[in-house]
Amino acid sequence: MGKNQVKSRGDWGLLGQGEAHSGEKCYLCSVMGVYRSLSPEEFRDIQQRILLEDNHLLIFNKRTGEIVQGDKTGDEPLSETLKAFIAQRDGKPGQVFMGVPHRLDRPVSGVVLFAKTSKALERLNEMLRKGEIHKTYWALTANRPPKDTDILTDNMVRNEAQNKSYVAQNGKEARLKYTLIQTTERYFLLEVELYTGRHHQIRCQLSHMGCPIKGDLKYGAKRSNPDGGISLLARHIQFIHPVKKTEVDVTAPVPVSWKGIEG
C-alpha cells in the first residue's frame, strides 16, 4: 500500500471545527496528504465522468445521491474522492487541492466545477459573485407549465429545520427563466436559467408554479424516483477560464434514466 493511500472509507476521521481550514470540515486523511485507494472499477468510473480537466480546474459529471462537499452525514464527498483519484492517477505526493466554488444538492445530477489551485478557486469565487459563470439546468415535470416560457419572480424564505424553502411575502426575491424544450408521453422538459441563487430555488419555484420536479417528494412530486434522486440536471456551464482567459463550455450528458429525452 502506497504512502498516499489508506485502506478504506472506514479510515476517515474529522478534525475539530477549530482545526479545519477556513472554519470548514476537512478530513484527517486529506490534511495529512493520505488518500484511500480506489478500486479499478471506481477509478475507471471517476475517470469517465471527468468532463474537462487542466492544471487549474476540473469539471465533473455528478450522479444523484453524491455529495459535493463534506456534511453532517459523514459520507465521502466528491471533493475527497477526486483528491484520492488524482493522487492515485498522478502518483502525487502530499496534499491534493480540490476547491469547491459551487455545490449541487445531493439529489441533483450534472455539471460540478472544482478548482485545482487556490488561485483558481479565488478567481472562480469572484466570477460567481459577479455573475460571470453561466449555468443552465434541465428539469422534468409531470405537469405542463402555464406558459411555454416565462420569468418567475417570487419571494422565498428558507426553513433551516426542515431544509426546505417556501414562497412567502417576507422572503428574498428569487427570479428564474424557464422554457419548455421537449415533451414526452408523460413528462415535460424545462430548461431553466437562474437570475438569483436561493436555497432550492428551482425546486421551490417550479413547485409553486404547479410543476414539481419528477421525484421531488419534498416539493410535491407524487412519487419518488427509483434512484432516490430528482430529475433536475445541471446541464451546461459556460465561462471564461480564470487563468487562460479562453472560453470554457461544457455540457453534461442526459441521465440514462431520463427515457425519451433527447440530449
State the predicted function of each range.
Residues G2-W12, E24-G263:
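RNA pseudouridine synthases
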Residues Q17-A20:
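Cationic, amphipathic, low-complexity segments that mediate targeting or membrane/lipid association
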